[in-house]
Amino acid sequence: MNSDDIRTVVFEILRRIAPESDPSALDPNENIRQALDIDSFDALNFFVRVNEQFGISVPESDYGGLNTVSEIVGYLSARLG
């Protein structure tokens, strides 16, 4: 899975978490929690869905460093190899 495929899946997950938003319009370096008004419960749901969709387990200790689309896609690209 390449970075574009990962980004597409991340956008789909974000659309489910924040259905009134358009994640694809985000600046890749913009904080998604602030831009999409995602609270801590929604953020947790996002990572649960990421784990399910990609078949990996993102440790909770990594959540705080994954705030932008670029950070999330880079992290997942590295984890998925």
Map each language-model feature to its residues.
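Conserved alpha-helical interface elements of two-component signaling phosphotransfer modules
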Residues: F41
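Acidic, metal-associated active-site segment
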Residues: L44-N51
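Phosphopantetheine-dependent thiolation modules in NRPS/PKS and related acyl-activating systems
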Residues: N2-I38, E52-Q53, S57-G81
